[in-house]
């Protein structure tokens, strides 16, 4: 069962990762850019943070400290060692131009 959660986060920093090999099929090899985007909740009292692993075109965008991004998180449950655990993945991320548009 999947559950989606939309929220606004503030960019702390962005760190580039070496491009990694991707293989679409046995005969073609290529490279895909990746980066980690470190986010925090835009509340000065909050200690919640999030690391987004971006790939492809999203990783080429230069996010700056203080940028606000709209993030859609996908929560899903998987069975591991006879127990269900919750996994969180980022389904979508977009730069917010003006926060008032989202309130």
Kindly label every feature range from the protein language model.
Residues 1-103:
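Single-stranded nucleic acid-binding surfaces, predominantly the OB-fold ssDNA-binding core
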